[in-house]
């Protein structure tokens, strides 16, 4: 059993679907449509068609659809998600073309999420995009954090998120 979510291109056309498992013990947490001529996971970001119009001068980059949906519901309309754990070079370049001043990496607080944050810093830097890293305590991901502590607490995390060098030095 999965919650199915449409994946849109920049113009708002549905190009694929993503499914998130409802059971925590499911073998694959997320499943996407097969790749096609119009849908390549490495070339797209979930909700970029909405976030590109945000008045915020940054994107919040996270891992999952539910994180993005939760953030948008809480008023963080610049949230986007990779269509896999880590950002790709193509996605980093796409972000760079969107005209935002920086990206706040808000990956899951587990080991793979933190590894993806380090990789993201490097790829975004190569694309000419400044990165900051949001670090959560008390929750595994942005969705859980917002549900437990609220939107104001998440806004404080965004404001206090450290630069890439601070993050790498603090590991």
Where do the PLM segments sit?
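Flexible glycine/proline-rich, aromatic-decorated loop/lid segments
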Residues: 92-97, 122-124, 159, 163
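Short, hinge-like loop/turn segments at secondary-structure boundaries
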Residues: 97-99, 121-123, 148-155
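Phosphate-handling DNA/RNA-contact segment within nucleic-acid enzymes
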Residues: 1-102, 117
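Conserved acidic, small-residue-rich alpha-beta core segments centered on
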Residues: 116-127
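C-terminal or mid-to-C-terminal helical accessory/interaction module adjacent to the motor/catalytic core
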Residues: 130-171
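Acidic beta-strand-to-loop metal/phosphate-binding motif
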Residues: 61, 100-112, 134-135
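Acidic, metal-coordinating catalytic cores used for nucleic-acid/nucleotide bond scission
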Residues: 66, 87, 107-117, 139-140
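Long, amphipathic alpha-helical "stalk/connector" segments that mediate intersubunit docking
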Residues: 95, 126-133
């Amino acid at each position: 059993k999965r919650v199915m979510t449409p994946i849109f291109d920049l113009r708002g056309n549905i190009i694929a679907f993503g499914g998130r498992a409802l059971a925590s013990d499911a073998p694959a947490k997320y499943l996407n449509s097969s790749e096609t001529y119009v849908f390549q996971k490495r070339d797209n970001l979930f909700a970029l068609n909405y976030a590109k119009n945000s008045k915020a001068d940054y994107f919040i980059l996270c891992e999952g659809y539910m994180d993005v949906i939760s953030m948008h519901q809480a008023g963080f309309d610049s949230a986007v998600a990779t269509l896999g754990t880590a950002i790709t070079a193509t996605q980093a370049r796409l972000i760079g073309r969107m005209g935002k001043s920086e990206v706040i990496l808000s990956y899951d607080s587990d080991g793979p999420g933190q590894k993806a944050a380090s990789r993201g810093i490097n790829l975004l830097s190569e694309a000419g995009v400044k990165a900051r890293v949001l670090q959560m305590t008390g929750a595994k991901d942005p969705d859980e954090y917002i549900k437990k502590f609220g939107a104001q607490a998440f806004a404080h995390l965004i404001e206090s998120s450290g630069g890439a060098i601070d993050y790498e030095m603090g590991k």
